[in-house]
Amino acid sequence: MRHQRIFGATTPLLLGAALLFGGSSTAQAACGLQSADNKIKHVVHIQFDNVHLRRDNPNVPSDLEQMPNLLNFMQNNGTVSGNHFTPLISHTATDILTVLTGAYGDRMGVPVANSYGFFRNDGSVGFSSSFLYWTALAADGKPELLSENGKIFPAPWAPFTRAGCDVGAYSIANMEFESVPGDVRTVFGIGSPEDIAVSAALNLPRTAANAPARQAPSTDYLGIAVHCALGSPLCNNSHARADALPDEPGGYTGFSALFGNVNVAPVICAAAPAGCNGSGAVKDTDGGVIADPYGRPGFPNTFSPLAKQSLGYAATMLEAGIPVVYVYLADAHDRNPVPLDPTTNLPGAAHAFGAGEAEYVAQLKAYDVAFGKFFARLAADGINKDNTLFFVTADENDHFVGGPASPANCDGIHVPCTYAQIGEIDTFLDRLLLTQRNNTTPFDIHFDDAPTFYIHGNPGPQDPLTRTLERDVDALQVTNPITNRVEKLNVFMADRAEMTLLHMITSNPARSPSFTMFGNPDYFNETSSASTGLGHDCSQAPACVFEGPGFAWNHGDVQKQITRTWMGMVGPGVIHAGRDDRVFSDHTDLRPTMIALAGLKDDYAHDGRVLIEFLDDHALPKSLRRSENFIELAQVYKQLNAPLGSVGLDSLRLANRSILGDDAGYAKFLATIADITTQRDALAAEIKPLLEAAAFDNQPIKEQQEDQLVRRARAIIDRVADLAHDEHDHDHDRH
């Protein structure tokens, strides 16, 4: 869910410059994908937000079951896995950026989302959005996408554009503008005509009459981009700007891009007029103009595009000769669009649905219709499973917070479900700590069901201030307003040492939280403000625990219901396995698998690995064909290195128990987990180059190598498992 990213609305601007094409508008760059048999001509990446393969109510068909046009396309023509996992934390920005890069948050800079805290030099805490354009500086002054060497992490479009392939992006995290005016200034420059116009619109008084004008810059600039190959006619015009990637390995000069609908639509509508309305506005799959709530053509809303909008824009991009397209689709379990409030002229309050509610079912039906039209339209264009690689996934799944469905036999399709109680349970942690523990330690958190804590002054892990707050947070109990049961908020606590093992600590120490509470998934945890009882105990209004009906689907946490998601692949080189859950994978595996199938290569080693179990031998280099050595090493590597593999989950159990124990035991834990992490990282650093070389350099893994590395990995896995399950002496190491 991206409900944390609420942008100020904006105003109609400049921007109707005439096209100055240097070549034919229907031409395209010579895209040189190097797939097996040269069959792949297009790549379509579809990224869902919180759409489920599994059923949330056993009687109600799942989200994907209610989208048979998509589900059948994937299962009949490729492979769908429901044994696919997120990183930690399991929130939208981190999950999508992990998919796009094939790297965990410690390497690409954003392990906490959809915003994250950082410590200033004086020990105070600031916050930055996890959604900014790829090359933007975050609020801490460092690159948003901060690599392990302090540079901007390599961009996902660069291998494609270097191969001569234009890349389109629609609402996909950080590949296009995410914030105005900040991202406009990053690309166009402070004081540029674009910046002046956008800033003027955003600075208009916040009145109902000004709402359309204040929204216009978002409509014009957010959410849409085309990254062009060298010499692409799509960027040979006055709409293009330099596509600057100053830290890209090997250099990246001479490339251009189109940013925002105001610059993209004129170009793709000239190249593919059937996808537009004749006035330069792109149409959705139903034939309506894609527009904001006030009717202005462009990016439709604050990053919650409907299927018909995302797929309609994607189809027009493909028809305009853009062979690689990334698109994002909003979830279907929240009301979308939210009607405008007649008083403020702004979108009204959010509203969440439970499984099987009539409006939820209707929205899924609309998604299904959109996919049917999308696939039919592409097929008519000659874009299909025989020449196109389709990757589809969901950022994370969710835990539903609400009472039981009524009637008990409702299925949503024949009998609609209703819910007497629905909505996440919100808490004010600072007021609960004051009331129950008399703890007034100043801190900030990233609001979430798995909040990251930032203690003012940035005390160390063994500082009494930190140790006391961790124990007091663990001791908090609340009464669930839905069930009337008394419950703990904490489930697992992770300190900095454990977060390092879980790939949650970046190269900038200032971004390191004091600790993370992976909490009870029914609760969304916040801190209070002046209007919500700041400084007052829970005997005073407003309540410290209450049900919020706007949102009912929690994620960010560690529970399998949230972290176990799904992925689907269709296209040349993908086996037709249908539903196949035998292989554990996570989001880092999608990027290397896509790049390998396309015959390209990234400028860095992935944290994931190519999923050869789902690929045809003919699509693989000889080094991977029927390679049991690769498979055995890759599978044990995932259990060793993935946050939700064996080592990650077992170490989290160990960490929680140790953090909440006595100081002497905690000191022993710190030494033990540091040793485990050092050994794990060193072994992973040996394994990753072998997996990469086998996948991208045709260098087979030798059996002797594989046997030795697998034995070492299993020794670490077993060691952590023994420590995690040794309740009597968790510091005793049996190995």
Residue ranges of model-derived segments:
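Bacterial N-terminal signal peptides
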Residues: 10-22
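Active-site His/acidic residue clusters
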Residues: 314, 319-366, 402-406
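A short beta-strand-to-alpha-helix junction
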Residues: 62-65, 87, 362-365, 423-427, ...
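A Trp-anchored, charged/polar loop motif used as the substrate-binding/catalytic surface
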Residues: 30, 291-319, 369-377, 462-507
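Secreted, luminal/periplasmic, and some membrane-associated catalytic domains
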Residues: 89-91, 101, 107-239, 244, ...
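Polar, surface-exposed loop/tail segments
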Residues: 480-511, 582-585, 589, 600-632
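Short, structured active-site-proximal loop/turn typified by the sulfatase FGly-forming signature C/S-X-P-X-R
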Residues: 54-107
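Beta-strand elements within well-structured catalytic alpha/beta cores of enzymes
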Residues: 39-53, 74, 99, 324-329, ...
